[in-house]
Amino acid sequence: LLEAGLFSFIIQRPYIVVADPNAKPKGIFVSAFDTNPLAADFEFVLKGQEKDFQTGLDALAKMAKTYLNISVEQKNPALTSAKNVTVTVFDGPNPAGNVGVQINHISPINKGETVWTLRAEDVIFIGRLFNTGRVDLTRTIALTGSEVKKPAYCKLKVGASLTDVFAGRVTEGANL
């Protein structure tokens, strides 16, 4: 993960910094849903990438106890029956999808402890690396909001310019 540049997707708490690869975290927390308004539906994002997702979870589970947090509405077996992780189901409005809230309910961080967190989409990157031997930072994003003419899901590489994505899809002159 370090050599491939993917370790930077792992965040250490407290302090929300890139994780120390030499540290032994109390646990690794992956939230597979987001209750923020306009957030992408992870079950849609996951379609066709279930194998990479599980491989990514397997890799994380070798580093520390790993928790996969899902929403009560999610039904994809890749989430509900994920292997080598502790699956916890959450219900409720925002901030139920916030990984910090989830950590506080499952295993609060005590003085001197650290935990690592990842976005579920980033777990797919890790799985792809182990399944293919190459880094592929393609991700599906939701193009949504009041200034979007036609809401849609778009596939792009992390760091890609959004100019082409916005072209013809958002209100002209909108302050984006």
Model features per residue range: what roles?
Residues 1-176:
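Buried, small/hydrophobic-residue-enriched core segments of structured protein domains
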